[in-house]
Amino acid sequence: MGEVAKQRHAAAAPAPAEAGTAAGGVGASGPGPQQPFLAADVGGTHARIGLVVGNAAGPRPVSVLHYHRYHCLDWPGLAAMLRDFVGQLAGTPHAALRGELRHCAVACAGYVLDDAIVNGNLPWPVSIREIRDGLGIGQLAVINDFEALAYATQFLAAGETRPVIDTAAAPAEGPVLVMGPGTGLGSAVLLPGRPRAQVLATEAGQVSLAPGNEREIEILRLFRRERAHVSFEDALSGPGLLKLYAALCELRGSPAQLLTPAEVTAAALAGSDGAAVEALEVFCGLLGSFVGDLVLLYGARGGVCLAGGILPQILPFLRASTFAERYFNKGVMRAYLQQVPVRLIEHGQLGVIGAAGWFLDERPGA
């Protein structure tokens, strides 16, 4: 799964100061305003880890002091990556902190069950106890990955997004939909408010796939041979793009020669494989239709932020595809959607910033 319903969990070391820590929040004692701590954003392909500190006077809630991106398949688990990251601090101005880090916020697709973060798209299980004990972490809090990303979008500067669909007027004040295809299909909704915004994590990627034309009906029939429930994530993800390509090769009566989502994307952009081009066209059309549905469902008048590893690579293709027409094609709601812009974010450190900012906000008295 790309992500599941909102889960917050804090694992505390057995010390009196942490006795009040429990699932559902950060607990009795978070990091002080100027106390550096670890924050990680873990996806199925990459994990991004940062050393952060609160920055109440800045445009974002935290400053990132040190940052590194890891390829998940190159490591045996998140604990090993965190140990490596802390080891890297030896060569930085923050070397003295290596033995002083007591708090960690993790944004991760999945949900917490007992000691583990459970998600089928991660290449390995994540043990909360292993992280806590291996690094001497007194407190580890887990937030859904797209929940963290949505939290961070409120701190985006104007130049940090690129238009997919522009509107004549500025977006209205209201909920912002944040979603994107990666290893899975994640989504969350930012709900503006005071004194602070709230975020609704969703299971939207698991909604049943709704074909919009005869070709998509044929594809759905092929997908249903594997299982009765076919979700949007089954098509709108890296693995989903590969499945679309395989299905279209079968419908075209041609062999499937491309073996990875990256190969399908490259062939589609180069125009060297007809089935790959059609697969990416179907992908973009389904994405536009689904995004439009979610805007209506959540009343996302504040706009849409698209994220995900594949989207920056295909942005010109996406703009030229049927994405916009499928997005607007909601009958009497077309005029409504024409007032809701869609923009692309290349999130980089945003998941780390979102997890860390949420962690600070959840401190008692924050």
Describe the predicted segments one by one.
Residues M1-E100, E218-A366:
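ATP-binding/phosphotransfer module of carbohydrate and carboxylate kinases, centering on a glycine-rich
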Residues A11, E18-G20, G24-G32, Q139-V176:
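Conserved phosphate-binding catalytic cores of ATP/NTP-utilizing and phosphoryl-transfer enzymes
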Residues Q34-Q35, G136-G138, A172-V176, L185, ...:
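Short coil/turn connectors at secondary-structure junctions
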Residues G54-P59, G120-P125, L156-V164, P192-L200, ...:
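A glycine- and small-aliphatic-rich helix-loop capping segment at beta-alpha/alpha-beta transitions
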Residues C72, N119-L122, A141-A148, T167-P171, ...:
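Active-site nucleophile and cofactor-binding loops and adjacent substrate-binding regions
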Residues G91-V142, Y151-E160, P312-P316:
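Short beta-strand-loop/turn "lid" adjacent to the catalytic site in phosphate-handling enzymes
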Residues V106-Y111, G180-T183, R301-P312:
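Glycine-rich beta-strand-to-loop/alpha-helix junction loops that act as flexible
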Residues P163-T167, P171-F232, L315-P316, F323-F328, ...:
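Glycine-rich phosphate-binding loop of actin/hexokinase-like ATP-binding domains
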